[in-house]
Design a protein with these regions (language model features):
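His/Asp/Glu-rich mid-to-C-terminal helical/loop segments that flank catalytic regions of hydrolases
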Residues: 245, 263-293, 354-359, 437-471
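Cleavable N-terminal signal peptides of Sec/SRP-targeted secreted and luminal proteins
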Residues: 4-20
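Zn-dependent metallopeptidase/amidohydrolase metal-coordination segment
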Residues: 34-52, 108-112, 334, 405-461
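Acidic/His- and Gly-rich active-site-bordering loop/insert found
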Residues: 22-32, 36-120, 139
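Alpha-helical metal-binding/catalytic segments enriched in His/Glu/Asp
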Residues: 110, 119-160, 251-257, 263, ...
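A short beta-alpha structural unit
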Residues: 60-64, 316-328, 339-345, 371-390
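Active-site-adjacent substrate-binding region
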Residues: 36-39, 191-245, 283-287, 291, ...
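Midchain, well-structured core segments that form catalytic/ion-binding scaffolds
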Residues: 159-160, 164-348
């Protein structure tokens, strides 16, 4: 177990180091580090967008809400300020493009999302948009934006969280051509469809217009996303930046266990068909299975050792919601429903875990004379980040930190992402790479979400360094 004061001490030393600057820096980093644009202005814009909310007292900005449209217009203005040609597509995605010296070449896309969860933090999604605009603004200020060998396009996706319509990646799935037309008729809690929500903002969508949003895979060379880590690893390591090797695949289940409802005082324990007890046993088994998959699953030691190591290091399982009926203190429940969220970098391993869970669940329910039903509500395959793109991002991040601190930085860590990102949708049409940015205590989807000003700077500087390789 680590010393409890080690993490804040490491973070303090790292923050102090990042406040240093040198007279000379890495060749890939501009000599003055562009603090005004890459840190001060970027941070100011993040805080400004953090005030654009549909709610009083907390941040809420869902797909096509009034605050969403206000944020989109602000982002579009900042894109114009950076010298980019801008437009909004029929799914509300905001685009800003620099043609560069060869407009017909394959384009590099840089993006993230501007929608939020309810009671959100101000950095999730927005950080990636703002640092991209800031990095391109530096190139425009220096007169080198039109010298890029490839077009570069920033995309601020309208919806990634899926809060309003319970469908994630509306924006990026439309651009990658993977959004089913049927989703346009999904309704929110007020029975408003996606089509209606867009129309209320003077945006017309149809099957034909949805097809027009899709980018041809042959026109794109790569997709880059800068995002807060949403976890504690970078803070533990005392480093502002890391690169992502892949994004975990995910399965969501809804489990319903039905038993016999009865009086809490009159039904003997041996005669009960208690769905709560069965659900509890299933949940404890799931925890043990996900903590110790190597001991719980059978596998070929020679062929599957690496896969098992990957599964063990990335597998996480969560029961986040439990609902009982009738939910009274003096009643044996008649029904218990709970959710399972299971994520891993190995898709085959994830399926093995699910198979093991289903088998044991069936046994438990039979032993306890209750009925179990399982619905698979969501499945997403793992995404592997492109090795070449990741290598370039890693070199850029290392150079940026070296330039900021003035001390040797051997390398930045290579990490797996347990959270889903727009990069998962974009991976359907192009190579993807991601840069993670440290966030305080690993907290996200919360008002407590926080990124140090200098860490915003480091991310923007790393992206600038990456873009300068195109000059």
């Amino acid at each position: 177990m680590h010393n409890p004061i080690s993490i804040p001490l490491i973070c303090l030393l790292s923050t102090l180091a990042l406040s240093l600057s040198l007279a000379e820096h890495d060749d890939s980093i501009a000599s003055d580090l562009f603090q005004t644009i890459l840190r001060d202005e970027a941070v100011s814009r993040l805080h400004q967008l953090g005030q654009v909310s549909d709610a009083n007292g907390y941040l809420e900005r869902t797909f096509m809400s009034p605050a969403s449209m206000k944020a989109a217009l602000l982002i579009q203005d900042w894109m114009k300020d950076a010298g980019l040609h801008t437009w909004m597509d029929a799914m509300g995605n905001v685009h800003g493009r620099a043609d560069g010296a060869n407009p017909q070449a394959k384009k590099i896309l840089i993006g993230s999302h501007y929608d939020t969860v309810i009671d959100a933090g101000k950095f999730d999604g927005l950080l990636g948009i703002i640092v991209a605009i800031s990095a391109l603004k530096v190139l425009n200020t220096n007169g080198t934006l039109d010298k890029l060998r490839q077009p570069v396009e920033v995309i601020a996706f309208s919806d990634e969280e899926g809060v309003r319509f319970q469908t994630t990646y509306l924006g990026s799935a439309a651009v990658s051509g993977t959004l089913p037309v049927s989703v346009l008729n999904n309704t929110d809690k007020n029975n408003v469809t996606v089509i209606d929500a867009l129309k209320s903002n003077s945006i017309e969508i149809s099957e034909e217009r949805l097809r027009e949003i899709k980018y041809d895979a042959e026109s794109v060379s790569s997709y880059i996303e800068v995002h807060i880590e949403q976890g504690p690893v970078l803070e533990y390591l005392g480093l502002p930046l890391g690169v992502v090797k892949g994004i975990a695949g995910q399965t969501r289940l809804k489990v319903t266990v039905r038993g016999t409802q009865g009086h809490a005082g009159t039904v003997p324990m041996k005669l009960r068909q208690d769905p709560m007890a069965a659900a509890a046993e299933i949940i404890v088994f799931l925890e043990r299975l996900c903590k110790f998959p190597k001991q719980m699953l059978s596998y070929d030691e020679e062929c599957d050792r690496r896969k098992m190591e990957s599964l063990e290091s990335s597998l996480v399982c969560t029961v986040g919601e439990i609902v009982t009926w009738p939910s009274a203190s003096n009643v044996i429940p008649g029904e218990v429903r709970f959710t399972v969220d299971l994520r891993a970098m190995e898709d085959a391993g994830r399926e093995e875990v699910l198979y093991g869970l289903m088998n044991r669940m069936s046994e438990i329910c039979d032993e306890r004379s209750v009925a179990c039903d399982v619905e698979r509500k969501h499945d997403a395959n793992a995404v592997e980040c492109d090795g070449e793109v990741t290598g370039k991002l890693r070199k850029a991040a290392t150079g940026a930190l070296r330039g900021m601190t003035g001390v040797p930085v051997e390398d930045v860590p290579v990490m797996a992402s347990g959270a889903g990102h727009d990069a998962m949708a974009m991976a359907r049409i192009t190579n993807v790479g991601m840069l993670f940015v440290r966030c305080r205590a690993g907290v996200s989807h919360s008002p407590a979400e926080h990124v140090l000003d200098d860490d915003v700077w480091a991310a923007a500087l790393a992206l600038l360094s990456f873009l300068r390789t195109l000059l």
